[in-house]
From Swiss-Prot:
Protein name: Calcium-binding and coiled-coil domain-containing protein 1-B
The keyword Lyase belongs to this UniProt entry's keyword annotation: no
Protein encoded by which gene: calcoco1-b
InterPro entries attached to this UniProt entry: CALCOCO1-like, SKICH, UBA_autophagy_assoc_protein
A biological process from GO: positive regulation of transcription by RNA polymerase II
Keywords on record: Coiled coil, Cytoplasm, Nucleus
Pfam families attached to this UniProt entry: CALCOCO1, SKICH
Compartments where found: Cytoplasm; Nucleus
Residue ranges of coiled coil: 143-305, 356-469
Species annotation: Xenopus laevis (African clawed frog)
Region annotation (Disordered) ranges: 473-498
Length: 547
């Protein structure tokens, strides 16, 4: 058993358009809305209970509350169910109400009280003037018929306004889709522009790197020029040194020639000295012969002295002269020997000095020749390195010129593309601004139209309410009711119910087809069997920050 305290839960279901009186033997339509966050199930049901009933088992009849397919837990859903005529309670003074019971047996909402009663006969009549014809004629029709016609006209006008509203909302949706498409295009253009800006920045950085490389190459070129100038100065210095070495070589050659001349002179002097020595040797040989002859003579004289001792005194004078001559010959021989030794020493010293000078001169000539060869090789290596540096410099200069030209062409092309993108971006921004203005105008027009529709709906709702109150208050003549089929309804009420059901369906379609406009629920209570006013959805205010 469920207590009555469960009838009003925190998140309740709102029942709409509950009439105080329902006609028996006719279908009853129940409209309700489920709140945000409510979990719906196919096992939920709506029942008709007596007001004083406390248990959910004591229901008169029930139908399953099937949720719509497009509904969700995060939205408010407007639903309706129908109770067939043959399941409804009998007419009387007993009060009933609708209860929404979920799958767990909890009551999630209940409606206002109502009763089932027979309709009263229509006793009131309305007098109408015939405006179409020129005759003065009065038409007397039942007030219910007149009000029914007025209700049909109002419903037709309201349906037309709803169709116009739907058309405008579809147009607004198309405009919003177009705006979203243009915004996506603009975003793509902005992304491409951003990528091109990054490419331009990359190219600028590359250009800066190229400029830095060019400056570095310029510095290297300046260093190479300084090195070339330095090498040229060194080459000039080496040329001067080579000229000096050539001069020294020429002086050495002159010295060599003079030494050779001296050598020739010394050779001549040596030849003369040799001749003189030979002459002196001949003289020494002659003197030796003379000495030998003198010695022979001395030996003969000594023999003669031995033999002729007595002739010693006589020949003493001859002996003295001979001794003096011998002494002179010895002195001359000693002088000649001394002269010969001096000449030989001088010859040997001259020959040694000449060989030393010749050897030193040959060594100096070889050293000078080696130095000249080394200088020539160094000159050739310097010329080759200078030629290689010149060729390398020319190659670097050509490469630098080619890279500079290519980068200049690429930079000009990127600048041109950047200018085109900037102009395209300006055009896109202008189109975006124009679309914003168009959207603002459309939204303002939609707001004004919504306000007009709200006003018309309120007016129609008030008129319909008044009409329905007047219809329910009328006492029509007794209408024939066919009880053969419990599903049949009275003709007038069936026509009104069908028209009001069409209006309700239009309102339901409008509510379902407008997901972009959040609605505020208004609990509207009018007479049954069908609702007159629907849940209106005001358009959201345009937020300029969403752009």
């Amino acid at each position: 058993m469920e207590s009555i305290s469960q009838l009003q839960p925190p998140m309740g279901v709102n029942f709409l358009n509950i009439a105080p009186t329902y006609i028996p033997n006719t279908k009853v339509e129940c409209h309700y809305t489920t709140p945000f966050g409510m979990k719906r199930s196919t096992r939920d049901w709506i029942g008709i209970f007596k007001v004083d009933t406390s248990s959910i088992r004591d229901y008169e009849t029930f139908v399953w509350a099937v949720p719509p397919e497009s509904s969700g837990e995060r939205s408010v859903s407007h639903c309706s169910v129908q109770f067939q005529a043959y399941y409804l309670p009998r007419p009387g003074e007993q009060q009933y109400h609708f209860r929404y019971v979920d799958q767990y047996g909890s009551v999630r909402g209940c409606s206002d009280a109502f009763v089932f009663g027979e309709p009263r006969p229509m006793e009131e009549l309305v007098t109408l003037e015939d405006e179409d014809s020129c005759m003065d004629m009065l038409l007397v029709v039942p007030k219910a018929t007149f009000l029914q016609n007025q209700l049909e006209m109002a419903q037709q006008e309201r349906n037309d306004l709803m169709r116009a509203r739907l058309a405008l909302e579809e147009e607004v949706i198309l405009k919003e889709k177009r705006i979203n498409h243009l915004e996506a295009t603009l975003e793509t253009s902005e992304k491409s522009c951003f990528s091109l800006k990054e490419q331009c920045q990359d190219l600028v950085m590359r250009e800066q790197l190229a400029i830095e490389e060019q400056s570095l190459l310029s510095c290297q070129e300046a260093e190479l020029r300084e090195r070339i100038l330095q090498l040229q100065g060194e080459i000039k210095i080496m040329n001067k040194k080579m000229q000096e070495k050539d001069r020294e070589l020429e002086g050495t050659v002159a010295i060599k020639l003079s030494l050779e001349n001296k050598k020739v002179v010394l050779k001549q002097h040596l030849a003369e000295t040799t001749v003189e020595i030979k002459r002196y040797q001949l003289q020494v040989d002659s003197l030796r012969e003379k000495l030998r002859s003198t010695q022979d003579m001395l030996s003969a004289s000594q023999q003669k002295a031995l033999l002729m001792g007595e002739e010693l005194a006589a020949i003493s004078s001859i002996r003295d002269r001979t001794i003096s001559d011998l002494h002179k010959s010895r002195l001359e021989t000693a002088d000649l020997a001394i002269k010969v030794s001096d000449l030989s020493v001088k010859y040997k010293e001259g020959m040694g000095q000449w060989w030393q000078e010749k050897t030193a001169l040959n060594h100096s000539m070889e050293a000078k020749r080696d130095q000249i060869v080394n200088l020539k090789a160094e000159k050739l290596s310097l010329e080759n390195s200078l030629q290689a540096e010149r060729s390398q410099r020319q190659a670097l200069q050509c490469k630098l010129n080619q890279e500079t030209d290519a980068r200049q062409v690429q930079l000009s092309e990127n600048r041109r593309q950047l200018s085109e993108l900037k102009s395209a971006l300006k055009v896109a921004q202008m189109e975006k601004q124009q679309l914003r203005e168009e959207r603002q105008g459309i939204l303002q027009y939609a707001r004004s139209l919504e306000e007009r529709l709200d006003k018309l709906a309120d007016e129609l709702w008030k008129e319909d309410k008044m009409l329905m109150e007047e219809i329910t208050d009328l006492n029509p003549p007794t209408l024939p009711v066919d009880h053969s089929d419990s599903d049949d309804e009275s003709p007038g009420d069936e026509r009104v119910s069908q028209q009001l059901e069409a209006c309700s369906l239009d309102e339901q379609d409008l509510t379902i087809n407008l997901p972009g406009f959040p609605c505020e629920l208004y609990k509207v209570v009018i007479n049954q069997p069908a609702p007159i006013a629907c849940q209106l959805q005001p358009l959201p205010e345009d937020n300029s920050d969403s752009w």
